[in-house]
Regions:
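Single conserved hydrophobic/aromatic residue that forms the stacking wall/gate
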Residues: 1-10
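Structural/interface elements that position substrates and couple domains in central-metabolism enzymes
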Residues: 11-261
């Protein structure tokens, strides 16, 4: 319950009321996959204690559904996966089903704006076969603003790079925040002056906690893909994951010892 009570868009209650029990159903029964034309997996790839991707977590979920699937279905992967995993999933499905139609079409929406953005953002579409690409393109052309074709590995990298880029953006803002606040100045006053009618600073991020479910792990996955030589990503990790400790130190400087408070 704590997970599913997250941010809701304003249109969500209206849409749920209109569709639940009619053309929208929720179930934990994997058998329902057998009767579907399209099966979409939204299992993200976590990282382990060594910051390496746990690819088997994704494969285990897909494997648990295979006995309910068939070769005529379009299978779509939506969540972040390590580069090359789409091909591994294709081999897994083909081995069990004889052949498959597999696409990787990464979701690009931001939390709290899902309904708005799924219609207004372009959708990257990649697939392991022409038939799968055509079906996936038709599916998302009915929803998204436009379809952008990539190879599966290009699409996997695009998803990781997008999230790593955002993580780096937040790290820059957080580093500046710590530099300024440590010296007793107001970061947001300075940031406001920087952005005031100055187009090149228009998209400068605000400081803030950047852990979340995606950005950190996807930055580390990109690093793992590059033999752990993504030095900007590692520096961003030190900044972003170090911000909570900085905030506690700032509180202690103002309030004294926080033990027991």
């Amino acid at each position: 319950d704590l997970i599913v009570t997250g941010v809701q868009t304003c249109a969500l209650p209206i849409l749920l009321k209109a569709h639940i029990g009619k053309n929208l159903f929720a179930t934990t029964d994997p058998c329902v996959a057998a009767s579907q034309d399209v099966v979409v997996f939204v299992t993200g790839t976590p990282v382990d204690e060594h910051l390496n991707p746990r690819v088997n977590d994704v494969l285990k979920v897909i494997s648990s559904y295979i006995k309910h699937m068939n070769k005529d279905q379009l299978v779509v992967l939506r969540s972040t996966i390590f580069p090359g995993v789409t091909q591994i999933v294709e081999n897994l499905l083909a081995s069990a089903l004889g052949s498959c139609k597999l696409a990787f079409c990464p979701e690009r929406i931001v939390q709290g704006k899902g309904i708005e953005e799924i219609f207004n953002l372009p959708q990257i579409v990649s697939a392991t076969t022409d038939a799968a690409f055509q079906e996936a393109s038709a599916l998302f052309s009915a929803i998204a603003l436009k379809v952008i074709p990539l190879s599966t590995t290009e699409a996997e990298l695009a998803k990781l790079m997008t999230n790593a880029w955002r993580y780096l953006e937040f790290a820059i803002a957080n580093q500046f925040y710590m530099i300024v606040e440590k010296q007793g100045f107001d970061f947001y006053k300075i940031l406001s002056a920087m952005k005031d009618d100055y187009p090149r600073a228009k998209h400068f991020a605000s400081a803030g906690l950047a852990a979340g479910p995606c950005l950190f792990k996807d930055t580390m996955q990109l690093s793992a893909f590059h033999s752990n030589e993504f030095f900007l990503g590692h520096s961003a990790m030190l900044v972003n994951e170090g911000l909570p400790n900085f905030l506690v130190q700032q509180l202690e400087a103002k309030m004294g010892c926080l033990k027991g408070r």
